[in-house]
Amino acid sequence: TATQYAFSDSNALSSVSQEAADENDALYVPTDNTVAANTGIVDGICRPAKKPVFAGEEGICAGCGVATLSISYYDLGYTTGEMAVKILNGEADISTMPIEYTDVTKKYNKTICDDLGLTVPDGYEEIEG
């Protein structure tokens, strides 16, 4: 069962993270600016509770996550630019243009995985730094 938790700012992040950690075996945090700026709050709650956090992107994973299927903001921007060119040149109709996806990179946070005693499957790259 998946449960959604919401917070409006960094002031609520601590209590919401605590509630989520208390009620779940693992957490998924999508790409979110508030979490990205406050990964220490999430890590300070989830790691001592032995609750793995799976992150929506590498920056959050580096701060509080165990693993991510990370997007490349460069690749995403490049693909978006290519789509914009097609629209501006009249080669595509924005209302019928299909959504395009970029590849993801499998990455993990060795320190947190080690602290939680997790073995990472083959095919994941260690997050540097």
Residue ranges: model-predicted function:
Residues 71-92:
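Hydrophobic alpha-helical segments within soluble ligand-binding/sensing domains
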Residues 38, 42-65:
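Venus flytrap/periplasmic-binding-protein-like
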Residues 86-129:
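Hinge/cleft segment of the Venus flytrap/periplasmic-binding protein
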Residues 12-26:
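Short, well-structured alpha-helical segments in soluble
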Residues 13-15, 61-70:
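Glycine-rich, charge-decorated loop segments at or immediately adjacent to ligand/cofactor-binding or catalytic sites
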Residues 24-35, 53-56:
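Periplasmic-binding protein-like
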Residues 1-10:
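Short beta-strand elements in bilobed, periplasmic/extracellular small-molecule ligand-binding domains
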Residues 9-12, 32-36, 59-62:
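Solvent-exposed loop/turn segments at secondary-structure junctions
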